[in-house]
Amino acid sequence: MKVIPQIRRIRLLGLALCLAAGVFLTSATASQPAAGANAVTAWNANASDATIAACILGGYGPQEARMYAMMHVAIHDALNGIDRRSRPYAASLTAAPGASPEAAVAAAARDVLVAVLGSFSFFLPANCANAGIASVEDDYSAALGTIPNGTAKTRGVALGRAAAAAILALRSADGFDTPTVDPNYQEGSAPGEYRYTPGTPFAFAPHLADDLTPFVLKDASQFRPGPPYSLTSRKYAADVNEIQRLGGDDVTTPSARTDEQTEIALFWADTSPLMWNRITRAVSSAEGLDLWESARVFGLLNLALTDGYIGTWETKYHYRFWRPVTAIRLADIDGNAATNADPTWTPLLETPPIPDYDSGHAVEGGTAAQVLRRFFHTDTMSFSACSLTLPAGQTCSDSSPTLRHFRSFSQAADENAVSRIYVGFHFRDAVETGTNHGEKIGNRAVNHFLRPVNQGARH
């Protein structure tokens, strides 16, 4: 299949992703709540819209996930101040009698989002951050406008603001202001060692995972997988040959991808926090979750997704394994007779400047799917999703978006993982290991955080 130049130029690197090909729009239609949405799912959609407006894309996944996690912790703890159904995360609050749950949700979300977006000056242009904040303020005014004035509203707002203040204080020095790009990182030179990828003579900060305070993990290395395979192994050769055949851009490099495999590659190029929150909105609305149930599932999801990034970045820089684009171009030095060098091999999309093993996208998918399986007590769930990284006319922001349909959380996670082969980013070993790594992080979140007070609760 020939990939149009517009899509080939999509870059998964920070603001470049916001600008390239016009695939990310600030239109509120990008994250409209699903039918049956409540105040919690509505604010999840509002946060996604603020993310898009603020250009928090591509390389800023950890910051994006953290913002959602903090917002949903504040929402969760505020609601539990009205009716304690699960253990709080940042603060044990008690609401004044009659406090409005919807007002509490809105105030908690608004205060966290405005504060976090305002703190992102270290990597966001001022106009981007201001656009995100304006989006939040518009949504806040609209939400409060639907709640009758009076004591219930006033008390709900006060409760939400107290919950927001608690999580903001708890995470005020958590290391997330560490610069993402490290221009001084020394690339490797031996076969198998990570080297700068074409077009990016720098690396995403190799010490970032060391600087970040996890939400649910004991430390960044808690579930670090074992090392990647030997360059001389049969499995390595098989993985090189697979991605060499399927991951090319079909312009400089011929590709054997099918049309559907190309769609999968581009569909899952969306950021993991945007995609998995979008999926969770659809499922939670279809399942009719109430405010408290919604607060818990989104809280668990985003706490775990944030730590998924921390865990995978620690793993990547512990092993520093080279990317497929480097491995294929330098296959003549890997010592494996079953691989063949192609010095001009080019992946479908530009490779992010961070080591291969394990796949962060796969970790995020494994994490999210495990949280959702555990929360809903089943893997079997039918749902559909759109994407913001498909060609123009097919995205979530378009009138007739292309939808992909899934019958289980595992199916979505597996497709998410294999997409990184089709896009030319990761070896199969990295995506399979990443999915398993993520499942362990998801289990950790569900086993130890936001646990129901009543063990007979539906969720």
Feature map (PLM): residue ranges:
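Intrinsic low-complexity/disordered segments
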Residues: 2-3, 29
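Bacterial N-terminal signal peptides that target proteins for export
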Residues: 3-15
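Bacterial N-terminal signal peptides
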Residues: 14-26
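Acidic/polar surface patches and capping/hinge elements
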Residues: 31-459
